[in-house]
């Protein structure tokens, strides 16, 4: 009975080298060996960030403004009141948008409630619309 070629080559090292044909084939190194050489194409295709990221990293904290329109304040007025961001002091209505998490008041839409609005920044359009109905804007304790 003659052994087949594969069986003959399994133990020796002439036909396929020492370890080839024993189950794992010819690996070309284990793990990440050869990523910069013979496994380069695999790395570029399946692991493009293998040697590190690309581009620049921003190391400063970016401050993102959270804006709100006058029309949105009008629309959300009841929910702001329910959540405690609208209060009444000395007969004057105060809307604290800074405490509600907003940084800038934009002038799109209409606001009809005469009140004092507390916010850090406001556009000229928002200020003119509010002053037309007799409202004020306060930022850092000073009126705008």
Curated annotation (Swiss-Prot):
Keywords: Ribonucleoprotein, Ribosomal protein, RNA-binding, rRNA-binding. GO terms for cellular component: cytosolic large ribosomal subunit. InterPro entries: Rbsml_uL15_N, Ribosomal_uL15, Ribosomal_uL15/eL18, Ribosomal_uL15/eL18_sf. One of its GO terms (molecular function) is rRNA binding. Pfam families: Ribosomal_L27A (PF00828). Residues 1-13 have a biased composition (Basic residues). Residues 1-32 are annotated as: Disordered. One of its GO terms (biological process) is translation. It comes from the Archaea. Binds to the 23S rRNA. Belongs to the universal ribosomal protein uL15 family. Part of the 50S ribosomal subunit. This is Large ribosomal subunit protein uL15. The gene is rpl15.
